[in-house]
Curated annotation (Swiss-Prot):
Family under the similarity heading: Belongs to the MsrA Met sulfoxide reductase family.
Protein name, entry field: Peptide methionine sulfoxide reductase MsrA
GO biological process terms held by the UniProt record: protein modification process
GO MF, one example: L-methionine:thioredoxin-disulfide S-oxidoreductase activity
InterPro entries noted in UniProt: Met_Sox_Rdtase_MsrA_dom, Met_Sox_Rdtase_MsrA_sf
SUPFAM superfamilies recorded: Peptide methionine sulfoxide reductase
Organism: Rhodospirillum rubrum (strain ATCC 11170 / ATH 1.1.1 / DSM 467 / LMG 4362 / NCIMB 8255 / S1)
Summary of the function given for this chain in its UniProt record: Has an important function as a repair enzyme for proteins that have been inactivated by oxidation. Catalyzes the reversible oxidation-reduction of methionine sulfoxide in proteins to methionine.
Oxidoreductase in keyword set: yes
Coiled-coil regions, chain positions: none
EC number per UniProt: 1.8.4.11
Disulfide bonds listed in the record: none
Active site: C10
Keyword Oxidoreductase appears in the UniProt entry: yes
C-alpha cells in the first residue's frame, strides 16, 4: 500500500472524487501544510493555522499508479486559482500536492510540467508541490461527508 496527499479546495468533494477510483483503498480528510498542531475546522477556516484542507489517499500501486492519481487531481479542480476554488476563498482551499518521497516529488513535478506544456490552461498553475508533513485528520463529521449527507437527505450536497 502507498499514500498520497492532495489539496484541491473543499475536501468533501476531493475525497468523493478519489474514493471512486479503483485501487484507492481509503481516504481521510484533514489538515496539513501549516504550523498549528491538532487544528480544528474552525481554526483552519479562521486562516490562522496555515493548513490546507487536504485528502490523504491510501492506494494499491498495483491497481492504480501515483501518476494516475495525479491525473485525477489535475482534472478535479482549477489549478490556476490562487488560494481558492470557486466561491471557497482562503489559503485553506489552495491547490497543493504533498509528496511523501522523492519518487512522488519527481512525478508531481513532471506531471505539472506536462500540463503546463500542453497549453490546456489559459493561466499559470498555482499548485504548490511541498513535502508532506504532519497530517491532522478532520473531525469525524467531515469524513465521507457527501456520503453521509446523501444517505440522510437523498441528495449529495454541492461542493467545489
Amino acid at each position: 500500500m502507498a499514500t498520497a496527499t492532495f489539496a484541491a479546495g473543499c475536501f468533501w468533494g476531493v475525497e468523493e472524487t478519489f474514493r471512486k477510483i479503483p485501487g484507492v483503498t481509503g481516504t481521510t480528510v484533514g489538515y496539513t501544510g501549516g504550523h498549528f498542531k491538532e487544528p480544528t475546522y474552525r481554526q483552519v477556516c479562521a486562516g490562522d493555522t496555515g493548513h490546507a484542507e487536504a485528502v490523504r489517499v491510501d492506494y494499491d500501486p498495483d491497481k492504480v499508479t501515483y501518476e494516475q492519481l495525479l491525473d485525477v487531481f489535475w482534472a478535479a479542480h482549477d489549478p490556476t486559482q490562487v488560494d481558492r476554488q470557486g466561491p471557497d476563498i482562503g489559503d485553506q482551499y489552495r491547490s497543493a500536492i504533498f509528496y511523501h518521497d522523492a519518487g512522488q516529488e519527481a512525478a508531481a513535478g513532471a506531471s505539472r510540467a506536462r500540463l503546463e506544456q500542453s497549453g490546456a490552461l489559459s493561466r499559470a498553475i498555482a499548485t504548490r508541490i511541498e513535502p508532506a508533513g504532519p497530517f491532522w485528520p478532520a473531525e469525524e463529521y467531515h469524513q465521507r461527508y457527501i456520503d453521509k449527507q446523501r444517505a440522510r437527505t437523498g441528495v449529495a450536497p454541492a461542493c467545489h
